Amino acid sequence: MRDIVFAGNLIVDHIKCIEALPPRGELAKILHVYRSTGGCVCNTGIDLAILDPELAIGAVGVVGRDADGDMVLETLTRHGIDVSQVLRRSVTSFTDVLAERSTGSRTFVQFGGACAEFDIDDVPLDKLDCKLIHIGYVLLME
């Protein structure tokens, strides 16, 4: 039995660091780029796994059949999170993040992708076997 299962959004953040957000129609040079997992399932699940490595944690959701989906599954697995209930289809949901070095502010543009296809039929209620389930970012799911 798992202690907790996180269900919902599995997202990859595509972060572009820039000096400042340019005016509309103008160009900003990207200083550096990186990717990071995001969304409720990844953020909360990984944080909890770090705080208590003895917890049995599971993930439920949908990622794409792409490199971002691979990254999400590898990252969760590396933190000891069971990904056996994560489905693969479509394109992994992502957020483009413009992070301004000058102000520290961030601007987000989100692509629904696989998470937009996630619904109650994707939750294996008969196989969850957990003490607690947390469903996050419900309003981002379509």
Q: Where do the protein language model's features map onto the residues?
A:
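Beta-strand->loop->alpha-helix junctions that form or flank phosphate-binding loops
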Residues: V60-R65, D82-T92
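Ribokinase/PfkB-type carbohydrate-kinase core domain
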Residues: M1-I11, L73-R88, E100-E142
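Glycine-rich phosphate/adenosyl-contacting loop at the front of the ribokinase-like
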Residues: M1-V60, A67, M71-T77, C130
